[in-house]
Each structure stands twice: as C-alpha cells, then as structure tokens.
C-alpha cells in the first residue's frame, strides 16, 4: 500500500509519556528481574509516517544471514541460500539491513532531497542529539557517557531472529522504532524477551511503537518469523553503548 509523504518538522521529538511509562524507563537498567518497555505513539503520527516513507525509500538493502557454529557460542555470516540449506537449529538470523547510508548524502545521489533532509534530521536526533541525550541520561547512572549505533532493517517472508542474548557486547539497551504502517497482528515479526527468571514478554511491531530492551546476562530475545508475503516490519534500531565501546551490528 502506498502512503503519501507527509512533511515532518525539522526536529524529531518524542511525544510526552504517562508518569507510569516514565517510571518504567527510569528503572530500565536497574529493575531485577529485567523488564522491557513497549510504548505506543512514540512520535507524532505525522513524523512517524514521514520517517517511515523515508526509510522505505532507502535504495540499498542487503540480506544479513548468520548461522550458529557447532557449539552455539558464536555466529558467522553466510549467503541466504546457505542459511536456507542449514539445519533449523543452526539458523541464527536472517533479515535485510540497509547499507551504504553515507553515500545517500553524496553530490549527485539519486535519493530524493526531501528524504535526505529528513534522514539527516533523524540522525541528529538518534545520533545523540540534545533531546535523546537528555532522555537517555535519565535511564543510566550518572557519569556514564553514551553513544548510539543506528541500524535500519526490514523483514521478508520467513525472516526472523533466533533466540540470543547479546550480553557479550557492550550494549546497555536497544530502542526499536517500528515504521510499518501496514502491519497487522497476523504478520508475525514479534519481538520476544525472556528475563532472568524465565518470564516472557512479547512486543508486536505496531506502527510508531517503540520497544526499549535492556541487554544483560541471563536474558534473551528473539523475533518470530515474518508471516506476511510482503516485505515489511521496517525498523530503526538504536543501540546505546558506552563511548569507549566498539560499534557493532544491532541484533
């Protein structure tokens, strides 16, 4: 389904949250056992639709497929065909990831100017602009400077993420902003999170909702298979990491 491009204000700014939601966010890294947070209506409807159109227009997507090694202690990249040929228990993850983002801003880029401007505005926000920096400071201990890694992903039929933890990384938490306006409940692609005590939380990728997920030892997360016959579940993932950490791919 095509959606008209809506103009967005220059500055991306999340909508104000209810007191209970703010409390849950402040406790995100301190709660024991861990608790993810799922917020509907993260941006204004106008900004979410405009950003979604810009992300869907990204021209360069690459299938990112990985399989587990024999002892399931690490993964390695493979081709999509190798992933399909692997046994089900070896299939760690497969979905499309946007590549060559910097080239979109080169002189002569075919990426439409309005999308370039909107994407640039979003990077100001997601790349530790003042609004996001102030919000993240509420969720972390004083004196812990953070930076962010941003990834754009989409899912085709059957794409999924297997159960894993990312606890070996330096990531403190991940924000996932879902930008598929055509998402329906039976499309699948649900983010699952299991805490240290074995309790599961399910977060459907509803349009303009945001999942905020702590990354810690003893917790795992996954994405259920994408059931739709169309490409969808367009997602912006923002991983918050200490400034000394080495950037890595957002899972």
What are these regions (language model features)?
Residues 20-21:
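Short, charged/polar N-terminal "headpieces" of proteins
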Residues 3-17, 26-135:
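Non-heme Fe(II)/2-oxoglutarate
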Residues 142-151, 187:
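A short coil-to-beta-strand element that immediately follows conserved catalytic motifs
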Residues 2-13, 153-171, 179-251:
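Catalytic core of Fe(II)/2-oxoglutarate
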Residues 138-144, 164-169:
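Short, conserved, surface-exposed binding loops centered on an aromatic residue
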Residues 57-61, 139, 182, 243:
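Phosphate/oxyanion-binding loops and surfaces in catalytic or ligand/nucleic-acid-binding neighborhoods
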Residues 125-129, 148, 168:
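Hydrophobic alpha-helical segments and helix-packing faces
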């Amino acid at each position: 389904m095509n959606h008209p491009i809506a103009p967005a204000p220059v500055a991306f700014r999340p909508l104000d949250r209810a007191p209970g939601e703010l409390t849950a966010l402040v406790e995100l890294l301190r709660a024991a056992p861990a608790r993810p947070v799922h917020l509907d209506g993260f941006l204004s409807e106008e900004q979410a639709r405009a950003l979604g159109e810009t992300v869907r227009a990204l021209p360069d997507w690459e299938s990112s497929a990985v399989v587990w090694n024999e002892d399931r202690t690490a993964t390695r990249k493979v081709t999509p065909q190798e992933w399909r040929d692997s046994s089900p228990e070896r299939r760690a993850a497969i979905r499309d990831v946007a590549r060559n983002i910097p080239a979109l801003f080169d002189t002569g880029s075919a990426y439409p100017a309005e999308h370039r401007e909107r994407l640039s505005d979003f990077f100001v926000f997601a790349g530790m602009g003042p609004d996001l920096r102030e919000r993240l400071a509420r969720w972390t201990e004083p004196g812990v400077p953070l930076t962010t890694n941003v990834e754009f992903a989409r899912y085709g039929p059957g794409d999924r993420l297997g159960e894993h933890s990312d606890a070996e990384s330096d990531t403190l938490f991940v924000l996932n902003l879902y930008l598929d306006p055509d998402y329906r409940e039976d499309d699948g692609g649900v983010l699952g999170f299991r805490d240290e005590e074995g309790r599961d939380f399910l977060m459907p990728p509803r349009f303009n909702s945001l999942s905020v997920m702590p990354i810690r030892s003893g917790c795992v997360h996954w994405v259920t298979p994408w059931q739709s016959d169309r490409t969808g579940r367009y997602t912006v993932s923002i991983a918050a990491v200490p400034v000394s950490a080495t950037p890595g791919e957002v899972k």
